[in-house]
Amino acid sequence: MKKEIVLTVFLIAIVASLFAQKSEVFNPSNKAIRGYDPVAYFTEGKAVKGNESLTYHWKDADWYFSSTQNLNSFSKNPDKYVPQYGGYCAYGLSEGHKAPTDPDAWTIVDGKLYLNYSKDIRTKWREGEKERIDKADKIWPGLKDKE
């Protein structure tokens, strides 16, 4: 009887921890970058809303694209275009926590896309961008699968 109780408690703890884990990709309503096209940041230099008929499922999220060309580019090399830290706020990560993002609060640094919570936060992040990237790069591996 005691073994069954211990086993039951153990199984409940495992199931609860699975539900407590957050996706590695920030994807409200299962839309990565809230439905914006990740490739467009690089090719058009601006945030562009994706088309619901042009999607690609990757890392438990649906990625939206504004053109077939962008969809094809992404499908060949997603890592080239995805935002750093799974699309969570770069500033927040540098402070040790996950935070949601605004697709219009973005920056490309050394060929990598970074998103932030808001344009005001992006301004703060840009003031010490290199140091913040170094901090967030160290923190991200421990936070990416956490609540």
Regions from the PLM with identified roles:
Residues 1-22:
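Bacterial Sec-dependent N-terminal signal peptides
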Residues 21-147:
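Charged, low-complexity intrinsically disordered segments
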